[in-house]
From Swiss-Prot:
This is Protein 6.7. It holds the Pfam family T7-like_gp67. Its main location: virion. Keywords: Virion. The keyword Transferase does not apply. It comes from Escherichia phage T7 (Bacteriophage T7). Plays a role in virion morphogenesis, and is ejected from the infecting particle into the bacterial cell.
Length: 88
């Protein structure tokens, strides 16, 4: 059996194909706003944005659990022993 590597596609006349008309605009475009609504830009005051305005509270509970926990080391050794036929 012989299979052709090229897939046969029907030939289309490009003169008969027309582009779709774009949807009509409901309003005339007056300007482009970047960064949100115009209500936010009209506020007065000293707002700090970016890295300087970012406040992050540190959670020490994760660091304490890692420092005080030798449970993972014990767990690994028990798994290793059980894999080689030893007791837990």
């Amino acid at each position: 059996m012989c299979f052709s590597p090229k897939i046969k596609t029907p030939k289309m006349d490009t003169n008969q194909i027309r582009a779709v008309e774009p949807a009509p605009l409901t309003q005339e475009v007056s300007s482009v706003e970047f960064g949100g609504s115009s209500d936010e830009t009209d506020t007065e005051g000293t707002e700090v944005s970016g890295r300087k305005g970012l406040k992050v509270e540190r959670d020490d509970s994760v660091a304490k659990s890692k420092a005080s926990g030798n449970g993972s080391a014990r767990m690994k050794s028990s798994i290793r022993k059980s894999a080689f036929g030893g007791k837990k």
